[in-house]
């Protein structure tokens, strides 16, 4: 694996800024690892506490991209239907410049989606942003447009939240929707296409396009719909493929000589598939008129799949329809109809394989056999947040603030606990100063210590929703809420 380790350092030199510890150049920082180096940020913070500044922003779920004295984000003003790339002065908390991105139509998606969900990438000379409503656009650090690469309006159920990565002399983008589905490399100076690899998997409504490519030596690793793939960064040649039951919502991380991926799907574990009641139970609890049938007004909400720890989120599951269960359309569900309905629904569920936290050898080749991939865990897999690795332990947080810690070498579970956060989690956790920073969608940011003892050190209420993953640079944590960007630092 020597070539891989050397390649990591080479790639870091190529695409990172000279001020490595002073930068957070893409989604989740250096190579999307989620690990901040240097001075630790505050443990306790919030509006009015350890707060350097706060700047109001238009809506958006993109994370802060921090390079030098600049912070780059994307925004969306819904009333004007206006997309923009924004540069904020890192020290003063003032908007330095804002450039409108001239989209003719605005991408639609899940109710939790925002058209400005993609995090910009910066190499110290240029900043590149992606919008499913427009395509790629590049500016220099003063806000002068350098190039653009327009793309058709992305159309999907979830919406495009994928983020570009600048690696060496190129920009890498994974784009997936009903219109097109591919991995793309363009010249970072001109926007000229270098290669494009169409994806063989047809993009469906159950798939997501939110992951960011990472680099290991000469290999790009991409979490794509129903697979994890590696590509040669120079040519786009597909080097290996791992087929898995995943919607591809999270970003992979590197852990030694393995790639760690949270492969999740909506029916991938028992907690997401509530049991169906027997007909006798239905009658006992819901037959209000005593006719030994279940009428339309008596039929309860029954989940085919369900996110029990994200119940407040819109469209958080799928339910059994009365019309499907009332097979003869006589207005009532009988003792003969219900078992047949359950049988069909269970067959439908059986079409979804179990998901899991996967460990894939970086130097795999071709179509990777299942026995070459380690499944570290199959329960409490996060849908959106990406995992973390501290050199020994693997951490991941799912909806409900459920934090799991595994020892990577053995795959043994060290603990499973709650962070204090509740509800849906969209932002990915981060490591800084020997602690984990975990953000809940309702704006509670919990800080827990690393290692075998998961003590909760603080619960910081931002008083606003947090869907964007924070950025941590030189002892400052930058938190984007639904309405503003905050900077927190110890006095």
Question: Would you name each region that the model predicts?
Answer:
Residues 5-14:
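Bacterial N-terminal signal peptides
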Residues 17-491:
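Noncatalytic, solvent-exposed loop/strand surfaces
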């Amino acid at each position: 694996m020597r070539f891989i380790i050397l390649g990591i350092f080479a790639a870091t030199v190529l695409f990172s800024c000279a001020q490595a510890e002073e930068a957070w150049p893409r989604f989740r920082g250096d190579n999307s690892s989620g690990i901040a180096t240097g001075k630790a940020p505050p443990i306790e913070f919030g509006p009015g506490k350890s707060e350097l500044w706060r700047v109001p922003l238009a809506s958006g779920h993109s994370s802060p991209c921090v390079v030098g004295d600049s912070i780059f984000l994307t925004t969306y003003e819904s009333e004007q239907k206006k997309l923009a790339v924004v540069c904020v002065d890192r020290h003063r908390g003032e908007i330095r410049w804002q450039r409108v991105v001239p989209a003719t139509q605005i991408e639609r998606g899940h109710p939790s989606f925002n058209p400005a969900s993609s995090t910009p990438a910066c190499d110290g000379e240029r900043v590149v942003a992606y919008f499913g409503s427009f395509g790629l656009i590049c500016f220099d650090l003063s806000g002068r447009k350098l190039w653009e690469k327009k793309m058709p309006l992305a159309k999907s159920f979830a919406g495009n939240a994928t983020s570009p990565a600048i690696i060496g002399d190129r920009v890498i983008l994974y784009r997936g929707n009903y219109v097109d589905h591919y991995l793309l490399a363009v010249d970072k100076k001109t926007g000229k296409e270098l290669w494009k690899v169409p994806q063989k998997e047809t993009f469906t409504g159950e798939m997501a396009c939110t992951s960011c490519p990472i680099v290991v030596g000469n290999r790009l690793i991409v979490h794509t719909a129903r697979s994890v793939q590696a590509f040669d960064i120079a040519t786009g040649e597909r080097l290996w493929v791992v087929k898995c039951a995943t919607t591809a919502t999270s970003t992979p991380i590197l852990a030694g000589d393995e790639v760690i991926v949270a492969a999740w799907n909506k029916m991938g574990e028992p907690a997401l598939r509530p049991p169906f009641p027997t007909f006798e139970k239905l009658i006992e609890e819901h037959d209000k008129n005593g006719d030994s049938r279940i009428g339309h007004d008596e039929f309860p909400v029954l989940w085919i799949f369900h996110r029990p720890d994200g119940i407040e989120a819109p469209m958080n599951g799928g339910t059994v329809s009365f019309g499907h269960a009332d097979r003869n359309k006589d207005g009532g569900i009988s003792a003969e109809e219900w078992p047949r309905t359950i049988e069909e629904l269970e067959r439908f569920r059986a079409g979804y394989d179990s998901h899991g936290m996967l460990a894939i050898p970086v130097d795999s080749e071709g179509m990777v056999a299942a026995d070459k991939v380690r499944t570290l865990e199959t329960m409490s897999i996060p849908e959106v947040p990406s995992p973390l690795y501290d050199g020994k332990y693997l951490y991941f947080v799912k909806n409900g603030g459920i934090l799991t810690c595994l020892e990577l070498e053995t795959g043994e579970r060290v603990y499973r606990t709650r962070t204090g956060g509740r509800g849906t989690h969209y932002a990915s956790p981060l490591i800084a100063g020997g602690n984990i920073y975990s953000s809940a969608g309702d704006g509670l940011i919990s800080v827990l210590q690393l290692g075998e003892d998961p003590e909760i050190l603080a619960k910081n209420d931002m008083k606003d929703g947090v869907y964007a993953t924070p950025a941590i640079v030189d002892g400052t944590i930058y938190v984007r809420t639904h309405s503003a960007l905050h900077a927190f630092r110890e006095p």
